[in-house]
Amino acid sequence: MKTLLLTLVVVTIVCLDLGYSLTCLNCPEQYCKRIHTCRNGENVCFKRFYEGKLLCKQFRRGCAATCPEAKSREIVQCCSTDECNH
């Protein structure tokens, strides 16, 4: 009986994803390769871009607790899986 209980405890611990943290791309460039581990409570990756001067697109990527609101002339895309904000 003790063996069965111990086996169930081990299986439960292995199956639970304890301490999981989302990873998002985090950089201001269009072609981003920098991976960042999000803090506890940041469950969303975002990509924000807008047209700057001379029609140059400016990018920002990172982690957030909720999807940021788009400001004037901005597009914001959000997702919730690892490195999904490419």
Curated annotation (Swiss-Prot):
Report the subcellular localization. Secreted
Task: Just give the chief location class.
Answer: secreted
Q: Which UniProt keywords are present, listed alphabetically?
A: Acetylcholine receptor inhibiting toxin, Disulfide bond, Ion channel impairing toxin, Neurotoxin, Postsynaptic neurotoxin, Secreted, Signal, Toxin
**Annotated SUPFAM superfamilies:** Snake toxin-like
Source organism per UniProt: Ophiophagus hannah (King cobra)
**Role of this protein:** Binds with low affinity to muscular (alpha-1-beta-1-delta-epsilon/CHRNA1-CHRNB1-CHRND-CHRNE) and very low affinity to neuronal (alpha-7/CHRNA7) nicotinic acetylcholine receptor (nAChR).
* UniProt GO MF annotations: acetylcholine receptor inhibitor activity; ion channel regulator activity; toxin activity
Q: List the disulfide bonds.
A: 24-45, 27-32, 38-63, 67-78, 79-84
Q: Could you say which residues form the signal peptide?
A: 1-21
**Family that this chain belongs to:** Belongs to the three-finger toxin family. Ancestral subfamily. Orphan group II sub-subfamily.
Q: In which tissues is it expressed?
A: Expressed by the venom gland.
* Protein name (Swiss-Prot/TrEMBL): Weak neurotoxin WNTX34
| GO cellular component entries | extracellular region
